[in-house]
């Protein structure tokens, strides 16, 4: 298994473009999965510079509906075959907002206190583009390719990983309520070396999400984690607990990035031996071992 980070807040090599977003290109056997598409078009230009032909993508998956994870797909769609499978989770088209009134340090920098953060497209857009492979999943765990799974329907995290009150969604009656991120999903690749988990933002709590992965794959250790852990706005105690979780886990590669935030990244760099600086241009692959028959727990 090989992954390449196409879009991220930071870049690892000169000539690549950074943006506040995330996009990862995953290669596993014959599968070419694009996990998230960033906010604008950095993933497109970076892919070209990295020698990756996005026309070869065999599937697309969105971690959740915030524009910094799927906005770039608006520019990418024309490259893809019309029947390419595109996976979102149920709730993907619920409108989401960031309420700056719950984030006092930012109030002076925003003229509007409510910022629409997703989704950047409506359901009809996919069909207008002729993308007939789009589908919304409702499964706890669905295999979308050999050894590649999408996991959703995460439990509401406990108070230590509670969703920040600034994250709100539009309820059935039009009122804004706390966002529980019903559409959030992660990608899990079952490799001979262990599980590789790709997250978008881990709004449902990275520790809670990884614990759910362990319950659904009880015989397989988590080897690597890449993606956002949503440790912003920074809470020193939550960051310390998260770093401690990683430090005492089976994880040998912690490519946390994006919404982990500057404070979170600094703590990981200083205290988590498995930490791997991650940004656009990162190429990482698992060692080659013979595969075992162990797999996920059937639910």
Task: Describe each model-derived feature in a short phrase.
Residues 2-50, 180, 184-199:
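Conserved beta-strand hairpin/beta-sheet module of binuclear metal-dependent hydrolase folds
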Residues 8-10, 37-40, 65, 90-92, ...:
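Active-site metal-binding loops of divalent metal-dependent hydrolases
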Residues 16-17, 31-59, 75, 102, ...:
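Pre-active-site segment of Zn-dependent metallo-hydrolases
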Residues 42-93, 217-225, 252-253:
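Active-site metal-binding motif and surrounding structural segment of the metallo-beta-lactamase
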Residues 53, 102-107, 242-243, 271-274, ...:
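Short, hinge-like loop/turn segments at secondary-structure boundaries
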Residues 65-69, 85, 175-186, 190-279:
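Cap/insert and terminal regions of metallo-dependent hydrolase folds
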Residues 265-266, 274-299:
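Binuclear metal-dependent phosphoesterase catalytic core
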């Amino acid at each position: 298994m090989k992954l390449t980070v196409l879009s991220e807040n930071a870049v690892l090599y000169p000539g690549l473009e950074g943006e506040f977003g995330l996009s990862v290109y995953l290669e596993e056997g014959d599968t070419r999965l694009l996990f998230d598409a960033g906010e604008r078009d950095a993933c497109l230009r970076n892919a070209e510079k990295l020698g990756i032909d996005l026309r070869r993508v065999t599937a697309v998956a969105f971690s959740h509906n915030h524009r910094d994870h799927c906005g770039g797909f608006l520019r990418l769609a024309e490259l893809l075959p019309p029947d390419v499978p595109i996976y979102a989770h149920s709730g993907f088209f619920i409108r989401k907002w960031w309420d700056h009134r719950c984030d006092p340090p930012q109030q002076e920098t925003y003229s509007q206190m409510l910022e629409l953060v997703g989704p950047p497209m409506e359901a009809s857009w996919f069909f207008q583009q002729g993308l007939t492979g789009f589908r919304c999943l409702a499964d706890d765990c669905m295999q979308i390719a050999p050894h590649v799974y999408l996991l959703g329907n995460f439990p509401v995290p406990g108070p230590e990983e509670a969703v920040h009150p600034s994250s709100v969604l539009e309820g059935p009656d039009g009122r804004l309520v706390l966002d529980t991120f019903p559409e959030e999903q992660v990608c899990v690749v079952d490799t001979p070396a262990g599980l590789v988990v790709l997250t978008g933002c881990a709004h449902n709590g990275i520790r809670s999400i990884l614990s759910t992965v362990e319950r659904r794959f009880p015989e397989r250790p988590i080897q690597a984690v890449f993606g956002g852990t949503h440790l912003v706005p920074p809470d020193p105690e939550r960051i310390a607990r998260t770093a401690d979780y990683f430090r005492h886990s089976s994880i040998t590669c912690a490519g946390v990035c994006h919404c982990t935030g500057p404070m979170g990244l600094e703590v990981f760099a200083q205290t988590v031996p498995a930490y791997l600086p991650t940004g656009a241009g990162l190429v990482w692959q698992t060692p080659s071992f013979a595969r075992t028959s162990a797999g996920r727990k059937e639910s």
